[in-house]
């Protein structure tokens, strides 16, 4: 099992191969880098940052995964160690050479695995050539066009969860605490779990989705519920063949396929018929992999 730590001082002395980056979403490119450090024969170490560096620099960034889920996904790949470094304004101002001395040298880094586009240090002035000049062995992971966290965000904002899953190597997930809602779903025969996600997490485009949660297929709604004149975004999921109280629990909802736009209906009967059709579509949906 991966050893998760917060400071380099918690790691025992060793020669290390390091994959370094934010790893938001832990997509197929990230996985390739982590597998490459595992293959070096050295202590395989992943260094990631929290909060996201661009947030520290004053930019708004919606994250694909929570830090906790990021750690879980990296752990599933199986490096020896995962170091979560706090990204601070002071760290962002380090010159590239200072960054290497402050972050990589204390780890006993011998090999750095990264994509050719990897940049670090103040103004992103550090690159792989600088790492080589500083005496580090650099292994370049081939970068596949379109495989990036930024592209995942673009696809999710467009509601293309299938395209996002192709880059991630798994379905995108929406995760959060189940909180009380309006109880309308129950009165219509389709009780839903109302999921409150962490602030700053990216939520896909409004619409109706097929997916799963707790190993049950699910029909999910993301949006403002226009049939009832809503204005606040909500994430609600009806779990097929599930009985039980989910309030107060953390629920992880996989999104497999976007079924349709959200809309208002001429009557409640028409709404119920459409929900039934959505549930049937969710029953037939195929999980992307």
Residue ranges and their predicted role:
Residues 1-10:
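Short acidic-hydrophobic, aromatic-tinged amphipathic segments that line or gate anion-handling sites
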Residues 127, 132-224:
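Glycine-rich, Lys/Arg-enriched anion-binding loops that position phosphate/diphosphate groups
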Residues 27, 74, 112, 164, ...:
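Residue-level signal for inorganic ion chemistry
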Residues 182-289:
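Phosphate/ribose-recognition catalytic cores of enzymes acting on nucleotide-derived substrates
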Residues 4-5, 82, 138:
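Generic structural signal for residues in well-ordered beta-strands
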Residues 10-72:
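N-terminal catalytic cores of NTP/NDP-binding nucleotidyl/phosphoryl-transfer enzymes
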Residues 53-134:
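N-terminal Rossmann-like or analogous alpha/beta NTP/dinucleotide-binding catalytic cores
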